[in-house]
Amino acid sequence: MLRWPLLLLLAVLLPMQPAALPDGPTYTADGQIKYPTGYPEWVFLGTGLDMSYTADTTPDHSMFNSVFVNPGAYKVFKTSGHWPDGTVMVLENRGATGASSINKRGKTESSDVMGMEIHVKDSARVKGDGWAFYGFERPGDRNSSGRMIARPASCYTCHEAHAAVDTTFVQFYPNALDVAKEKSTFSPEFLKENTAAAK
């Protein structure tokens, strides 16, 4: 007799559980994040050139920083303005090359990946807001895995203090920025910073 009430209770509770994204993060047995081999085919959020968070630095070489996000996460973001559990953002660093092929001016990306970090939302593994950063020692090696960067590393404090949405730098990704504006999901920190900058 208890079977039907139990099934009804499950029917009510199960939709409340966040669904795992099919393209979400995967891990090794010891908790490292696996290299997301398909990320070049993910949603491209944006690229910065020679970005720095301090004004008094002069790079000795130019660098492109491109960000990709798994399609499942971006689909949810477009409807809600927030990143769901299972979000994987890949920051890919490539050097900039000058004249090559028919290019005589400006810069293009080099073929070698020089650096990679991953920003992941996984509430099952990470306490608090669920977000964690992972770094790769061999960024171009598809068989490699990334270790979680421990708090209180500067990447955490910087993102928490300045990120536009959910500790992510949506302010640098034009299409995602439009979504955040439409959904009014900017963080209080970002709004406060922008208000102060406008004065």
Language-model features: locations:
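Bacterial N-terminal signal peptides
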Residues: P5-P15
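Boundary at the C-terminal end of the N-terminal hydrophobic targeting segment
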Residues: M16-P22
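Amphipathic, alpha-helical segments enriched in basic
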Residues: A19, T58-H61, N93, F133
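Sequence context surrounding c-type heme c attachment/ligation sites in exported
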Residues: P25-T28, Y35-V43, T47, M51-S52, ...
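Alpha-carbonic anhydrase
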Residues: D30-Q32, T37, G48-M51, D56-T57, ...
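N-terminal post-signal-peptidase region of extra-cytosolic proteins
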Residues: H61-T79, S101-K104
